[in-house]
A protein has these predicted regions:
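Structural motif marking the loop-to-transmembrane transition
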Residues: 16-28, 177-180, 184
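A transmembrane-helix-recognition feature enriched in membrane-embedded lipid enzymes
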Residues: 180-202
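Electropositive, gly/pro-rich neighborhoods at or near active sites that engage anionic ligands
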Residues: 3-5, 15-16, 37, 41-42, ...
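N-terminal Lys/Arg-rich, disordered targeting/topogenic segments
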Residues: 1-24
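A structural signal for short, hydrophobic/glycine-enriched beta-strand patches
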Residues: 47-184
């Protein structure tokens, strides 16, 4: 009996098909590993969200990053408790006045006598740069950072790029009820920023 002859058409198509299936399988496995890694990191991020700092903890100054309810009021409470000498509110809209900010925080305008408004920052990175300039100008060595729990890690990551190592930063997370989508968004932004910094992209 003569050996079975290979169909040249099938022979030509089988190789590329198997190659495509191999590539698809490899990409699927990579995607699965990345998804599991993201989920594991997200779980860690969620379970270790920072807490508010005790109001009695003293620092030279308090820095409030705008963008969420209760942050400016928290900073004012720190000032009123005598736990900081001065406050920076970073990322204030250019059309917002001191009087309007006082009204929004349900506070008198006089309480803003030791408060500086930062109008230059438009995102977390520029928040950090604005804060670093302010800290250097006043020669502060300790600051209390007020922002949301989900935003805190990314804010501290950006500050670590621009603040001297000698400056101590105390995390003070505003107690708000986070939602799963908001935490997932913050975790993804934090993760992407860490990767960018690791790759040397400022």
């Amino acid at each position: 009996m003569s050996p079975q002859r290979r169909n040249p058409v099938l022979g030509k198509s089988a190789g590329p098909r198997r190659q495509r299936m191999t590539w698809a399988g490899a990409l699927g496995r990579i995607a699965a590993v990345l998804l599991l890694a993201w989920l594991g990191g997200f779980l860690w991020f969620t379970l270790t969200l920072p807490d508010p700092a005790p109001i009695a903890v003293k620092t030279d100054a308090v820095v409030v990053l705008t963008g969420g309810a209760g942050r400016t009021a928290r900073g004012l409470a720190v000032l009123e408790a005598g736990s900081a000498k001065r406050m920076l509110v970073s990322g204030v809209d250019r059309n917002t006045t001191r009087k309007q900010l006082a009204a929004a925080a349900d506070s008198s305008k006089s309480r803003f006598d030791t408060t500086d408004l930062g109008y230059e920052a438009i995102d977390t990175r520029s928040n950090a740069e604005e804060t670093a300039r302010w800290v250097k100008r006043h020669d502060f060595s300790t600051i209390r950072l007020v922002t949301s729990a989900g935003h805190m890690r990314r804010a501290r990551l950006e500050l670590s790029r621009v603040l001297p190592l000698s400056v101590l930063v105390v995390s003070d997370a505003v107690p708000v009820e986070p939602t799963a989508p908001s935490i997932a968004t913050e975790y993804s932004k934090y993760l992407l920023r860490r990767v960018a910094l690791m790759l040397g992209a400022l």
